[in-house]
């Protein structure tokens, strides 16, 4: 317990609690949780570009998202299927790393790049466009306006939401892979792609990688957020 206390601060715990509360508020929760969906679907899209094509991405009000891609070979399909949950966990880790180093502007620019790429190239449904424009405006505001403490707190909320969602969404897919193995999203897709690895193992893999990134964050001390 003492070792854990040395790795986190009360401020980190406070923002995790805030993230959990915010993501469970009707309507608002779905709106802010979409940031994780954006990262997840962007992960699929970016990896699909290596030997494949991204047709469209749809972002829906219920926080679900769909990336339509085509691939020229098996490996492209395989790595595209893995990329979604991996990107969610990695960007959550990266966000806290930047915040712990007080490098706020690079983090905002990275998040803006995700928004810009999707708005210009892939997202075409009405809600997806609305969400990207509104959230993109927030990032632009953070980039040019606001005190350091305001920017840090806003980014901490976003990073905390990404961390919470990366863990809960991968846990959900783990549960679905056992309860509904034929309707467990990426786990089902990878089971069909690999044929010999069942959805349950992919569900375990997705959850394990999210835990691994969280543990890596603890070891790196990136959750020790100063005032």
Please annotate each region the language model reported.
Residues 11-15, 47, 51, 188:
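Short low-complexity stretches enriched in small and charged residues
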Residues 5, 13, 57-222:
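Metalloprotease/metallohydrolase-associated module, dominated by Zn2+-dependent proteases
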Residues 1-2, 222-227:
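Membrane-interfacial, low-structure loops and terminal tails that flank and connect transmembrane helices
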Residues 2-43:
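N-terminal signal-anchor transmembrane alpha helix
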Residues 1-4, 47-52, 146-149:
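Short, mixed-charge, low-aromatic patches
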Residues 26-77:
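Small-residue-rich helix-interface/hinge motifs
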């Amino acid at each position: 317990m003492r070792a854990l206390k040395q790795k986190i601060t009360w401020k980190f715990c406070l923002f995790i609690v805030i993230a959990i509360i915010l993501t469970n508020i009707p309507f608002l929760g779905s709106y802010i949780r979409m940031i994780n969906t954006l990262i997840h679907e962007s992960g699929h899209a970016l990896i699909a570009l290596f030997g494949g094509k991204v047709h469209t991405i749809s972002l829906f009000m219920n926080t679900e998202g769909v990336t339509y891609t085509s691939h020229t070979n098996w490996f492209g399909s395989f790595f595209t299927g893995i990329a979604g949950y991996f990107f969610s966990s990695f960007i959550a880790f990266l966000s806290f790393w930047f915040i712990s180093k007080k490098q706020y502007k690079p983090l905002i620019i990275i998040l803006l790049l995700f928004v810009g790429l999707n708005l210009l190239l892939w997202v075409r449904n009405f809600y997806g466009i609305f969400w990207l424009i509104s959230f993109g405006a927030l990032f632009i505001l953070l980039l040019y306006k606001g005190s350091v403490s305001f920017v840090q707190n806003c980014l901490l909320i976003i990073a905390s939401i990404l961390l919470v969602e990366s863990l809960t969404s991968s846990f959900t897919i783990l549960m679905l892979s056992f309860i509904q193995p034929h309707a467990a999203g990426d786990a089902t897709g990878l089971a069909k792609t690999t044929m010999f690895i069942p959805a349950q193992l992919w569900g375990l893999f997705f959850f394990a990688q999210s835990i691994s990134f969280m543990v890596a964050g603890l070891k790196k001390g990136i959750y020790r957020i100063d005032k």
